């Protein structure tokens, strides 16, 4: 080392030049540390103040906080658990089960200096509803907790331009397990929108994230939380097209009476839930349940979810909302395309209907003399119906003619040449809304006589509706029952016994005409009594299915009489059967007629030949009556004759049905 070198090996001149620069660097570093220390200490002090205040106020116990975090009480053990299953929704390690530590972790996150980008949000924005509520309770000091601009949220809310919220109920769609009870979603109504422009609003939907097309697989996985459910937002007209046009489901729109702050609170929470998912359960934690939780966040003073501990049927959840004082503003009915077409068919005679059908398929030209022979209003009605039906068929994915678009233009052109209005009355809304129908659960108290023995019976059904129930608020011809059961006590030696248990029974009786030709079908599985060769009646497990046709026929009572025919098949399994099983098939016929608005009667005849295993020929026929006392009470009278194992017996039963 040279004598004029510094210990670091630098020439002395260079060292003398760099030394001031190094001193300046050290000065700034020490100054920064001096500033950070007090700032960090100040943050810790303010966080400690907020935490202490939140504990004093017991904020973690407040209903508002528990709703924001989707906590629900444990079924057996004390405490709560959060329903959200996305890992980043709860910030504390034990935040899913500890509202207090989650609140304190949330407070700590609000001091984050993270800047908002397209991919990242500051916690004040990511959990904007939590921030707003805690700010209301604790009064955050902007000088001690800098507020972050939430530009992405503000832009999203401005796009929605919210003025109101409507609860939307598409009616039941029996051919889709996820919608066989109906469905609910929310619509954010924008400012300056009316009934004609509501289609441009946005809808908030909760559904299972799956592309599963097998209904049985979907139902099984949905029963056990096999799918992740999440919220999504899309233009309302897309949902209307899906429900009204493709699935032939009428839509009820319930405009809610929410204030501007309540709407804002709801939207802030929806923003928080954007990336969050929940385990989807078919019966309870489903679309309707989580929409109720959104409404509870919007208006914390209401309790909508506590009654739906075990199952949440969409119609029941709508009923729960409507029952809240001052919640409902008005309703609007939006008929499906199929309903509109059926309405038009009711205004025409047979020849006009046939002509419209043939025109829609291109089998008859718009210039056909049979059309021009009609009065101008009838010509217009025929062409409009042909055009509507053509578009309906196209929307369902079928191609009725080689060039449907060209035929549609031709029909529009022909209609434009007729200077006459149809003056058709609009489709009338059903007299009974879905929220005004009978309760979806039912208990029946009955007494009767079977094969010479008197009995009393208790029958229960958690959900939903059968063919003999009053149709108001439900789809006629659709039966959906889960876990129906009957218990009887007989006089004499038989005593008390379980008569039947049916975990699932679904029947769709869909009438056909020239325009609509659906198949009717049945499916049920469960345990029922079957008489065997020794005269005993074991409880036998079986699976039963059927397919058939149904029609509406004129009747003298001015009601809709339904006639149907099925080919049915049954498989039964029990060790007491010959060979341990029985396979059978056979026909069934039925008719259903409403004698008055309260009185329904139905008759049926079913025969099956069991050709494998425990062979037998069985017959069953009967007459059923139902008289409605009020919305949730009805009387039933059932008379039947059965034959099994060459033995016959009669049964008579009278019951009081209670719906709730």
Predicted features along the sequence, with ranges:
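Transmembrane beta-strands of outer-membrane beta-barrel proteins
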Residues: 441-443, 458, 481-483, 517-523, ...
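Transmembrane beta-strands of outer-membrane beta-barrel pores
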Residues: 447-453, 464-466, 486-493, 505-507, ...
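Repeated loop/turn-to-beta-strand initiation elements of outer-membrane beta-barrel proteins
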Residues: 466-473, 480, 508-516, 552-562, ...
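Membrane-embedded beta-strands of outer-membrane beta-barrel proteins
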Residues: 458, 501-503, 543-549, 587-589, ...
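Active-site nucleophile-His-acid catalytic modules used for acyl/amide transfer and hydrolysis
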Residues: 236-311, 572-574, 644-646
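N-terminal accessory segments that precede or flank the first globular/catalytic domain
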Residues: 42-220, 370-507, 551, 593
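Outer-membrane beta-barrel "beta-signal"
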Residues: 460, 648-660
């Amino acid at each position: 080392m040279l004598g004029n070198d510094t210990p670091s090996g630098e020439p002395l001149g260079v060292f003398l030049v760099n030394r001031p620069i190094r001193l300046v660097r050290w000065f700034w570093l020490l100054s920064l540390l001096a500033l950070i220390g007090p700032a960090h200490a100040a943050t810790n002090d303010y966080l400690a103040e907020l935490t202490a205040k939140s504990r004093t106020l017991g904020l973690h116990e407040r209903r508002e906080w528990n709703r924001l975090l989707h906590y629900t009480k444990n079924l057996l053990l004390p405490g709560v658990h959060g329903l959200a299953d996305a890992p980043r929704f709860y910030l504390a390690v034990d935040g899913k089960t500890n509202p207090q530590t989650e609140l304190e972790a949330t407070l700590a996150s609000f001091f984050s200096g993270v800047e908002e980008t397209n991919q990242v949000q500051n916690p004040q924005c990511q959990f904007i509803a939590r921030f707003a509520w805690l700010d209301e309770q604790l009064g955050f000091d902007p000088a001690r907790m800098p507020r972050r601009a939430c530009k992405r949220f503000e832009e999203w809310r401005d796009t929605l331009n919210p003025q109101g919220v409507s609860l939307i109920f598409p009616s039941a769609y029996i051919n889709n397990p996820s919608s066989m009870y109906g469905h609910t979603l929310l619509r954010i109504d924008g400012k300056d929108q009316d009934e004609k422009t509501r289609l441009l609003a946005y809808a908030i939907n909760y559904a299972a994230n799956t592309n599963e097309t097998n209904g049985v697989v979907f139902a099984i996985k949905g029963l056990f939380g096999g799918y992740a459910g999440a919220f999504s937002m899309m233009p309302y007209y897309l949902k209307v097209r899906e429900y009204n046009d493709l699935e032939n489901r009428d839509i009820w729109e319930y405009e809610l009476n929410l204030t501007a702050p309540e709407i804002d609170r709801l939207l802030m929470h929806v923003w928080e839930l954007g990336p969050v998912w929940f385990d989807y359960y078919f019966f309870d934690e489903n679309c309707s349940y989580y929409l109720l939780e959104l409404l509870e966040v919007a208006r914390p003073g209401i309790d909508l979810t506590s009654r739906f501990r075990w199952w949440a049927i969409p119609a029941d959840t709508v009923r729960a909302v409507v029952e809240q004082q001052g919640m409902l503003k008005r309703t609007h009915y939006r008929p499906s395309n199929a309903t509109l077409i059926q309405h038009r068919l009711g205004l025409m005679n047979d020849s006009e209907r046939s002509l419209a059908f043939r025109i829609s398929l291109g089998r008859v030209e718009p210039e056909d003399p049979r059309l021009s022979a009609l009065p101008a209003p009838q010509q217009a009605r025929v062409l409009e119906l042909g055009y509507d039906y053509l578009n309906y068929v196209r929307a369902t994915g079928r191609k009725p003619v080689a060039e449907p678009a060209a035929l549609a233009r031709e029909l529009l052109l022909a209609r434009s040449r007729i200077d006459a209005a149809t003056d058709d009355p609009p489709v009338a809304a059903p007299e009974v809304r879905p929220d005004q129908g009978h309760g979806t659960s039912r208990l029946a108290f009955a007494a009767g006589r079977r094969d010479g023995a008197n009995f009393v019976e208790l029958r229960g059904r958690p959900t939903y509706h059968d063919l003999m129930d009053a149709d108001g608020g439900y789809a006629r011809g659709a039966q959906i029952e889960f876990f129906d059961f009957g218990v009887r006590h007989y006089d004499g030696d038989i005593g008390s016994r379980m008569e039947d248990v049916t975990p699932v029974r679904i029947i769709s009786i869909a009438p056909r005409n020239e325009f609509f030709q659906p198949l009717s079908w049945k499916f049920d599985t469960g345990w029922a009594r079957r008489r065997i060769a020794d005269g005993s009646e074991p409880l036998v497990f079986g699976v039963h299915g059927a397919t058939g046709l149904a029609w509406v026929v004129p009747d003298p009572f001015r009601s809709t009489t339904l006639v149907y025919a099925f080919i049915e098949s049954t498989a039964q399994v029990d060790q007491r059967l010959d060979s341990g099983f029985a396979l059978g098939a056979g026909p069934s016929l039925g008719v259903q007629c409403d004698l008055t608005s309260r009185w329904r009667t139905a008759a049926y005849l079913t025969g099956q030949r069991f050709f494998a295993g425990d062979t037998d020929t069985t017959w069953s026929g009967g007459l059923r009556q139902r008289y409605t006392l009020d919305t949730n009470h009805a009387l039933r009278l059932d008379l039947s004759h059965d034959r099994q194992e060459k033995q016959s017996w009669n049964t008579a039963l009278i019951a009081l049905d209670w719906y709730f």
